[in-house]
Amino acid sequence: MGTKGTVLNGIQPSGTVEQPEHESGFNEMVHAYVAAKFYCYLTEWFGERGKKAFVHGTQLHAEQRGRRMAQRAIRNGEELNFETYNRYGEWISTDAVKRLGIANQTKVVSWGPDFENRVYVCPWQKQFEAMGMTEAGHVYCEHLDNSICRGFNPYLSYEVTQTLHRSDCCIHIVRNAGMKPDTDRSRRPEGLKSFEYHCANSFWAYSEVSTAIFQAKGEAVSAAVLADFERDYGKEMADAIMKYRDVNFNVVDE
């Protein structure tokens, strides 16, 4: 997965990225890399405004995912409740992170009335840490899942009270979720998307927000991220991201 090198500490355009271990192709760690790179450039070039833009981009691509989930559920006559939210998720752990032993490890500590889930191992956290970017990871994760849920159904109350980047686990709480220990939380396979798709969704959401806010300088941020991506993952994977330029991520495509 790109060239091995020194761990990044903030932005280092001419450097390399140290992965947890070598794996080729799109996966959770590549997805985290995209977010980390946008955080690097946005905060270095624009300071606090850049951080706010990063949060806005995170919320955009997360809400887009949630809306696609909701559209599939509505098509199938499902209620937009938290059980359906679980079943219509768009990803499952890749073989790459399973081989590395860093696939998500979670534990439900409360089923009701509030559903509480804790995450103890996460490949996104591992990637942010390997890049020396735990603050970027914390900002990303405190806004991601609650935004996916908001895109799915804004009337569900989803809270992220701590993240693995600063604590021993992430804590996710959904108020009055209506969940039970025997609730089916398995993913419906027809809604799963590849990590190539998810990485492209992330890249183009951040790119759209960066350009809208910072105009030509925002376009330069996207170009810098893409250049780093091609350096670390190769032209073929960078070209794969580019082919999604005109995709409407707000709607289901099948």
Residue spans of the language-model regions?
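N-terminal accessory segment detector
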Residues: 1-114, 123-143, 150, 156-169, ...
